[in-house]
Amino acid sequence: MNFYMKYLLSTALIALLLVSCHKEQNAFEQSPSERMKQQRTALQNELTEAPYGWKVLYFPRTDSLLFATPTKAEKRSDSRYVEKLLNQGFGGFYFLMTFHKDNTVSIQADTYSQTIQTAKTSEYNLSQEAQLQLSFTTYNYVHQLVNNRFRAAADWLYVGKDTLQNIVFKTASYADPAREYIVFEKLKTSEDKQQFLQKAYNNRLFFEQMQNPQIVIKRGSKIYYQSDVYLKGNSFGLNTPFLEGFVANRYYVFEYRTNPQEDPSTGRYRSQFIGSGYVGTEKGLTFRAGLRYSHSLIFYDFVRQGNRFVAEHRDSKGIATGYIAEIFDN
């Protein structure tokens, strides 16, 4: 390499370093308050520049450990079992939210037909101290969950984005993971906006109106778990408040008798349980913290196929493992 070429190369490298240092210097020249203001403005722009609004999935109070060991059989007559069922976990809710630049938000909810059709307009605020926070400052459908049952919150802390570029929030209620779930997904078409909440409601209602919902977990022809107890019947001593809790709390438990020869009328047989909170989606059902067969085999999202809900298990890399879970009315 001759002297002239070396000179040009050195000059280019020096210029590149100077530009890089200048950019870095500009970043550090911003004060913390300026950076926070920039982040707040960016989030507000993103929320308000979604012409069709946002699908918001909110599980305010999940419990990943309530039925976390289904392969461990429990006595149905055990007081701990009864306490777990009567104090079962809680499911989620689906909202349609449309944010406006005047700090108002229109919200529809999946609770009833009326809440799907009737939007409530309330005020919201984006503030930032230690963390960027979205607060619903006047009453809307979210506040209906701020009670002793669901223990929801109307102040949501911005976490960031997931791998699908959905916006993720949390609340200050829990430090532990898997205790709540708040995800915003941008709606892409006016048709989605008009239909997704009604479809989600219909799928949830279809599941809740099943007379004898059961689940089977299988891989090929091999069955790993198949529930077989008729929980909605009266022959096993389940009282009305317990059954009402399934729907009111949006939580369901599937039960499998480990010894079919035991008399079910005694209530003293041993069973294995799988349970989780749920919500209807436009495609089917979503369970959080998931229907768990083992620590690595957990089913979350079920697609409605005719009269069944089917979930295909995938590993941490998104590769199908061959395990399938199906919920059906037996």
What are the language-model segments listed below?
Residues 4-11:
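Sec-dependent signal peptide recognition
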Residues 17-20:
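C-terminal motif of bacterial Sec signal peptides marking the signal peptidase cleavage site
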Residues 43-46, 96-98, 156-160, 297-303:
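Short linear motifs in intrinsically disordered
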Residues 57-59, 98-100, 108-110, 127, ...:
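A structural detector for beta-sheet-dominated domains
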